[in-house]
A protein has these predicted regions:
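Transmembrane alpha-helices
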Residues: 25-36, 115, 152, 159-162, ...
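Membrane-interfacial helix termini and adjacent extracytoplasmic/periplasmic loops
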Residues: 6-16, 48-52, 56-59, 67, ...
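C-terminal transmembrane helix and the adjacent membrane-cytosol boundary/short C-terminal tail
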Residues: 1-15, 96-98, 105, 163-174, ...
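N-terminal, non-cleaved signal-anchor transmembrane helix
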Residues: 1-75, 140-143, 266-280
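Membrane-embedded alpha-helices of multi-pass transport/permease systems
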Residues: 37-40, 44-47, 89-93, 126, ...
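Interhelical loop and adjacent transmembrane-helix boundary motif
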Residues: 1, 15-20, 46-71, 212-264
Length: 280
């Protein structure tokens, strides 16, 4: 028996009436306009000399960002690029152990992996400082504590995505592969991974974006050796350098949009490759 997912009869559920549709459209339009207004304010602020005092158009703020803030940009991208693939790997391992292996304690592993995200960022930052500020594992002031904080805090979305994707895949597909002589590793890499790849990439994108934009835990973990764009924005705001803070924000927004676009293109390319392999 094949379940196509198509309705077998005419649906009796009616859509919203004209009045309700107009209200929904108007509400969405107001929200979108407000978001675009905020982006426009930040962009405008990044192009003036002194916000509210000297509104002469200038690019000096961006020159400041790429001269005095180049290290923060490099560090932010490096940490995000290191943590993102590790987050994808962690999501696959925890998700597969929970949804497929069902080993003893797998639910506890899932709960613990999600618990880190439910805690406030300030609590997480302080906890990492206390936990890794002394031997045998001393990570304070290094890149490793930042990567670990982002990895274990923001990989929860990827874990949930993988678990949800695996729960929708019939285990008999993998059993059929193994019954035809494929090893467990071959089945995992050739069958399971391609099927849950969109969920993995969605989780990786979530982790990358939050690694770029996180601030609550970050302010406790940065050091003179490692600084991030978000902390530079905070520094500019505390020093009343609003134009420079806006310029840093625009650079961060552009980087996040570029990263999201690249991951989307990668997802489409990999999905097409998977479809081509399936056809052949």
């Amino acid at each position: 028996m094949t379940v196509s997912g198509k309705a077998g009869g005419r649906s009796s559920v009616k859509g919203p009436g004209p009045l309700l549709s107009s209200v929904i459209v108007a509400t969405v339009a107001v929200v979108i306009a407000f978001i675009l207004y905020l982006y426009a304010i930040i962009l405008t602020g990044s192009l003036v000399k002194v916000w509210g005092v000297n509104n002469e158009i200038t690019l000096e703020n961006y020159s400041y960002v790429f001269t005095h803030g180049s290290k923060a940009i490099k560090d932010t991208l490096l940490i995000a690029c290191i943590g993102t693939p590790l987050g994808g790997l962690l999501a696959v391992l925890v998700g597969y152990a929970t949804a497929r292996l069902k080993v003893r304690g797998s639910r506890i592993l899932e709960t613990v992996s999600l618990l880190n995200y439910t805690l406030p960022g300030t609590v997480v930052g302080i906890a990492y400082i206390i936990a890794f500020n002394d031997k045998p594992i001393m990570l304070t002031g290094t890149i490793y504590i930042l990567v670990a904080a982002y990895l274990f805090r923001y990989s929860s979305a990827g874990i949930r995505n993988v678990i949800a994707a695996l729960s929708q895949i019939d285990p008999s597909i993998e059993e059929a592969s193994r019954s035809l002589g494929a090893s467990s590793v071959k089945t995992f890499t050739s069958i399971t991974i391609p099927l849950v790849l969109p969920a993995i990439l969605a989780g990786m994108r979530y982790l990358f974006i939050h690694s770029m934009t996180a601030i609550s835990a970050t302010i406790f973990l940065v050091s003179v050796h490692w600084t991030l764009i978000t902390t530079r924005i905070l520094e500019c705001m505390t020093e009343l350098q609003f134009a420079q803070a806006c310029a840093f924000s625009i650079v961060l927004i552009v980087l996040v949009f570029i990263a999201s676009g690249v991951i989307n293109l990668l997802a489409r390319a990999l999905c097409r490759s998977g479809d081509a392999i399936g056809v052949h």
